Structure formats: structure tokens, C-alpha cells
């Protein structure tokens, strides 16, 4: 198996997720690192945002992550072996105002990774665009939608629920513009 130093973000996230699983700590990857995995190199995030699905104590997380070389530094866990760092944003796991119902799983040489589905990843990025006008997140949503199958009916329904039908139309136009380039 690869060393931590040799792992890309997906491999490291799977390694961490599998290690935590062995100790009864159930996490799911969210945020920009999911974009990195689904958008195949269009975007790189050094921050691995794991949502703790069971509300594990910080003390237990520290103990278990130390076993694989990660030390707590402020709100992050860092290792001398990698430029990637781990964070545990507070849950629950949600996109916009809705909880995530079903997670995706990917198998890597380094372990199994639970993460947002491509559709929920797009919704997560669109949430930042819809509510804060974050155009970088809009671009990330476009990249994922170009690279992975997306449930368009679900994204349209969710966008309506978020009160962002006009911005959904803008997202579709941006996707079309990017496809024509």
C-alpha cells in the first residue's frame, strides 16, 4: 500500500475513513475535497472535510488519528507526511436546508470512502452560489456536472426548495457555456 506521503486526496480520504471505521467512528467526506475527486483534477482542495455522523468526542478523534500520524493543530489535524489536512465541520450532514439521505461509496487501494454523491456534491456547491453568490463554487458545480451523472430532476426540485430557481437557470446556462468551450 502507498505511504501517506504518496497518496492523493481521494486515497488519503479513503485511508482515513477506513481507519476511523475500524474504531467505530463513522464519517463522510464533504466540501471541496469531494469536488477534487469527482472533477478529475479540475480542482484541488488540501482540506479534507469529514462530517462525523455519530458525534464522536474530539478526544477519541485525536487518539485514533494520532495512530496514523495526524496531530491536532487548532481546528485541523495535520501530518508532516502530507500537505492535506483534516477538518471535522459540525454536522449534521446537509446540503442547503436539507439533510443528506444517501451517501456514495468509492473503493480505493487505500480503503473505502463514504462521501457525498455527485448530485449532492453539486447541490453542496450550488448552495454556496445560491446563498452567498460564490462563483467559484458555481464553477465547481459545473465541473462535477460535466464529469459525473447528475440527477437533474432532483437538483431542480432542491433548487426550487432553496428559493433559487433563477440561479438554477444561471447554473444550467453556465454549464452549457462551459460545454461549448
Please provide the spans of the model-predicted regions.
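Compositionally biased terminal segments of proteins
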Residues: 1-181
Amino acid at each position: 500500500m502507498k505511504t501517506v506521503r504518496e497518496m492523493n486526496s481521494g486515497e488519503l480520504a479513503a485511508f482515513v475513513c477506513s481507519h476511523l471505521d475500524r474504531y467505530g467512528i463513522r464519517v463522510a467526506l464533504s466540501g471541496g475535497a469531494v469536488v477534487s475527486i469527482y472533477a478529475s483534477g479540475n480542482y484541488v482542495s488540501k482540506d479534507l472535510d469529514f462530517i462525523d455522523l455519530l458525534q464522536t468526542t474530539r478526544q477519541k478523534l485525536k487518539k485514533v488519528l494520532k495512530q496514523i500520524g495526524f496531530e491536532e493543530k487548532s481546528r485541523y489535524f495535520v501530518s508532516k507526511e502530507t500537505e492535506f489536512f483534516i477538518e471535522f465541520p459540525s454536522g449534521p450532514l446537509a446540503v442547503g436546508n436539507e439533510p443528506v439521505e444517501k451517501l456514495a461509496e468509492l473503493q480505493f487501494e487505500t480503503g473505502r470512502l463514504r462521501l457525498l454523491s455527485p448530485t449532492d456534491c453539486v447541490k453542496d456547491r450550488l448552495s454556496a452560489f445560491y446563498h452567498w453568490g460564490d462563483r467559484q463554487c458555481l464553477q465547481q458545480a459545473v465541473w462535477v456536472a460535466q464529469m459525473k451523472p447528475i440527477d437533474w430532476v432532483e437538483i431542480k426540485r432542491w433548487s426550487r426548495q432553496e428559493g433559487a430557481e433563477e440561479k438554477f437557470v444561471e447554473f444550467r446556462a453556465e454549464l452549457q457555456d462551459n460545454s461549448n468551450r
